[in-house]
Amino acid sequence: SCYEKGQCVFDDVVNELAPKFEEADGLVIASPVYYASANATLIACLDRLFYSSHFDKTMKVGASVVCARRGGCSATFDELNKYFTISGMPVASSQYWNSIHGAAPGEAEKDEEGRQTMRTLARNMTFLMKSIALGKEQFGLPEKEAKIPTNFIR
């Protein structure tokens, strides 16, 4: 299986992304919104990437960005952020949910608030990555406890 092998059994872009992700201080995931959900190809890629890669993702900063004509942004934003939070990754925030609006190519460029949200996100994510790097140098990473697995059916 992918988990046992330490990489995805389907040898494609996921296995190319994993070492880049491992070296990175942060990860930005962006998706259009379809039926209040992220692009299915992206979700499949993220499922495979996060499941098959065994490196420690703790304190890598994550940020999600979504784009929609009108609705479904908050559900999609939440869906993408779950990859970060289950992996111990701090989530960079902005002044609002990280969404921008537009239906046709070029329309999102007219969303002034959305563009401001993206600029704020970029500054906040950069600050957070620099702060974590400085904290690692001065204090190290927080101590990790051994995981205690729990099944809901006993």
Features from the language model and the residues they span:
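N-terminal beta-loop-helix "entrance" segment that forms/cooperates
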Residues: 1-7, 104-107
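Helix-loop-strand module that forms the ligand-binding subsite of alpha/beta enzymes
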Residues: 3-96
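Glycine-rich phosphate/pyrophosphate-binding loop and the adjoining helix
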Residues: 90-154
